């Protein structure tokens, strides 16, 4: 009996500790958060940063970790350049999606010809810049406030996005309204966490970088 009571108390403590990390935002806080992210996104013309991407599979305990460099240029250009453990590139120049593995030639697919790529580009670009995502009518959005950051949970409404993700979670710095990390939760329960670091803003980035050959 005592053991059962002890376990119950531990469980309740853990649940309280987790929930205490973030509190639901008030309506006034929501407006303030959206305003700050929109302002920060508007001020950001380009971005370059290192990233660490961790893939957690629902049916395995092991995690798969990738590292690389991400480039973004307003409005619709993004490049994920993976450097570890394997070299590959996923990039978009606003018109096409480019996929390249190792030294092979890139595969090219028009964004508009594929609804999935079109929606994916919005999620990826919005996920790293905040641009057009936090206030999008295409998502049911929940805002939460933590000690040093905001947590924004977006549940997609469109089928094309639902087929990819059950939710997108953004973690945003309170100090400068910059996206710190993105969590992509798939329908299968698999989770991908992308953490951004060593961020450089508004630097010169050549357009050719987004058109992989």
Q: Which functions belong to the PLM regions below?
A:
Residues 23, 69-118, 192:
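An acidic-aromatic
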Residues 41-60, 71:
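A short, Trp-centered hydrophobic/proline-enriched beta-strand micro-motif
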Residues 16-21:
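Sec/Tat signal peptide C-region and signal peptidase I cleavage site
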């Amino acid at each position: 009996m005592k053991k059962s009571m002890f376990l119950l108390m531990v469980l309740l403590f853990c649940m309280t500790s987790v929930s205490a990390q973030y509190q639901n935002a008030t309506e006034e806080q929501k407006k303030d958060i959206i305003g700050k992210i929109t302002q920060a996104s508007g001020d950001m013309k380009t971005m370059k940063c290192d990233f660490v991407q961790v893939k957690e599979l629902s049916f395995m305990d092991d995690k798969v970790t990738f590292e690389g460099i991400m480039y973004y240029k307003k409005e619709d250009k993004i490049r994920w350049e993976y450097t570890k453990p394997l070299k590959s590139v996923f990039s978009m120049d606003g018109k096409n999606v480019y996929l390249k593995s190792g030294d092979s030639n890139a595969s090219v697919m028009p964004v508009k010809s594929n609804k999935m790529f079109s929606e994916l580009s919005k999620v990826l670009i919005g996920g790293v810049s905040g641009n057009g995502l936090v206030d999008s009518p295409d998502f049911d959005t929940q805002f939460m406030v933590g000690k040093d950051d905001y947590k924004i949970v977006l549940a997609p409404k469109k089928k094309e996005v639902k087929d990819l993700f059950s939710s997108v979670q953004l973690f945003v710095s309170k100090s400068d309204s910059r996206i710190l990390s993105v969590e992509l939760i798939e329908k299968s329960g698999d989770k991908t966490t992308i953490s951004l670091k060593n961020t450089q803003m508004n630097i010169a980035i050549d357009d050719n970088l987004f058109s992989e050959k």
